[in-house]
């Protein structure tokens, strides 16, 4: 009888404590993105599906920057990180506000980009977002950029989070492209030994009358290498 009681006690504790310990590991992974980083942004179109014979690919793009990611909010279910960018010549650098990422645990309320500057509200069920974290990204002007939800995975020495979500054209494309109106962003945030990486597998889409047509694929690989503050 004592063995049965002990077994039930251990099972109960594992059921209750595991989600909390997993959640805490998730939170530490998110907060590990804070700090000062040398950043390298790389983007390139990988595949073209356009039927237009005059189609011109976007040129590959590589940028470097120094960025500070500062924790500005943390509570039981929310973490907010503001990114500050240093740009300009080394002799005369200047600081600008950059993007912000807000993480929420088991968030059910989403504003998802449709196309042509139109957003749609979507409520997801508790079962859909169980154990997940949503990442909402804001632009320099605090306007919404995109929002997606996924599960943090900690396995084989890796910690990563993945989500696919619709978004407007990125800033690097907005001024040079008008032949598509939606980006489907495949985001992977992975914690690395040097810092972290934001890996993207994006689709460039024409959305018309709720029908999507993919004209190109794009790969993004952004590395954040930690340096002294």
Model regions: which residues?
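Low-complexity, serine/threonine/proline-enriched polar segments
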Residues: 73-154
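Generic short beta-strand segments
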Residues: 38-47, 84-86, 164-172, 199-206
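Bacterial Sec-dependent N-terminal signal peptides
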Residues: 1-22
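N-terminal helix-cap/turn-to-beta initiation motif at the start of protein domains
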Residues: 21-36
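Short helix-loop boundary/capping segments
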Residues: 126-184, 204
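Short, solvent-exposed loop/hinge segments that bridge or flank secondary-structure elements
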Residues: 22-26, 42-76
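Hydrophobic/aromatic beta-strand elements that line small-molecule binding cavities or substrate pockets
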Residues: 56-59, 63-73, 82-84, 100-102, ...
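Acidic, serine/threonine-rich low-complexity disordered tracts
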Residues: 181-188, 193, 197-229
């Amino acid at each position: 009888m004592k063995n049965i009681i002990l077994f039930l006690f251990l099972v109960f504790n594992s059921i209750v404590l595991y989600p909390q310990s997993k959640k805490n590991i998730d939170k530490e992974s998110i907060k590990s993105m804070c700090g000062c980083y040398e950043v390298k942004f790389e983007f390139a179109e990988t595949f073209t599906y356009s039927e237009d014979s005059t189609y011109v690919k976007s040129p590959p793009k590589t940028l470097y920057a120094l960025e500070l990611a500062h924790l500005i909010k943390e509570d039981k279910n929310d973490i907010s990180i503001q990114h500050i960018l240093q740009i300009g010549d080394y002799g005369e650098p200047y600081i600008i506000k950059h993007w912000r990422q807000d993480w929420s645990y088991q968030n059910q309320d989403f504003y998802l980009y449709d196309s042509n500057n139109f957003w749609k509200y979507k409520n997801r069920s508790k079962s859909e977002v169980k154990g997940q974290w949503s990442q909402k990204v804001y632009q320099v002007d605090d306007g919404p950029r995109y929002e997606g939800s996924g599960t943090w995975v900690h396995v084989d020495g890796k910690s990563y989070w993945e989500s696919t979500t619709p978004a407007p054209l990125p800033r690097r494309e907005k001024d040079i492209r008008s032949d598509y109106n939606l980006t489907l962003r495949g985001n992977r945030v992975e914690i690395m030994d040097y810092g972290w990486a934001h890996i993207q597998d994006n689709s460039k889409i024409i959305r018309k009358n709720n029908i999507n047509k993919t004209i190109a694929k794009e790969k993004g690989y952004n590395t954040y290498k930690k340096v002294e503050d």
